[in-house]
Amino acid sequence: MPQKYRLLSLIVICFTLLFFTWMIRDSLCELHIKQESYELAAFLACKLKE
């Protein structure tokens, strides 16, 4: 049973990150999240606005 909750938590976190990235896609080029021994880094190809 705890394994189901772990998988569900991971899915919720992934969807939350995707939604967050979609919301601020024009201003987000790099995202770093550090927590204890884990690190999440996401990089997007960004064009500088002229």
From Swiss-Prot:
Report the InterPro entries cross-referenced here. Hok/gef_toxin, Hok/gef_toxin_CS
List keywords of the entry alphabetically. Cell inner membrane, Cell membrane, Membrane, Toxin-antitoxin system, Transmembrane, Transmembrane helix
Q: How does it sit in the membrane?
A: Single-pass membrane protein
Q: Where are the transmembrane segments?
A: 7-24
Its localization reads: Cell inner membrane
Upregulation = May be repressed by MqsA.
Which superkingdom heads the taxonomic lineage of this protein's source?
Bacteria
What cellular-component terms does GO give this entry? plasma membrane
Q: Can you tell me which family this protein belongs to?
A: Belongs to the Hok/Gef family.
What extra comment accompanies this record?
Answer: Interrupted by an IS150 element, which silences the locus in strain K12 MG1655.
Quote the protein name from its UniProt record: Protein HokA
Source organism per UniProt: Escherichia coli (strain K12)
